[in-house]
């Protein structure tokens, strides 16, 4: 029987399912026991420094990318952008702008695939297609959803990057201020925070990002990107 971290594959997927059921109910703060299910993944950095790692999934997007970049520049902050390959092809000028501004690029598959509902062969080809575009070693699965067999394959070829704070900016029932409070309440030194670079999250991110940057930077924190060679 296939295993992951010593646990049967069915058990690992069942436990992870409990945390990511269609993203209708989601953990803002990822429990430690969940992080231990995939120990090869990066969930957060050491806790002793006043450093926060912002990450933006799904871009580039014409609605939000340029504004995010300008806002980060205003505060001299860096971030990591997990880009979708088809969006890179649609908006190459925005993708170039992310790289020119010195941020880290991560792989978020070519078509934003759900690993639970996609065959391994198709999924791996889709991830590789993005890797050919970006050269990125860091990989974040869309929705966080991977089968144990996919984890076991991908961790040999990429550095899996998850998160320990999920802002909820995609949640239409969550107010922008509640999203901000999610981050402020649950982030610790070394936290990796997920926000989204897409039209659905634009209103919330427009509210959250400048307030988030002001809060942390005025308190002496650094907003840092993930090293693109992390795990090498």
Label each residue range with its predicted role.
Residues 56-58, 83-85, 107-109, 141-143, ...:
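A cross-domain feature marking catalytic cores of carbohydrate-active enzymes
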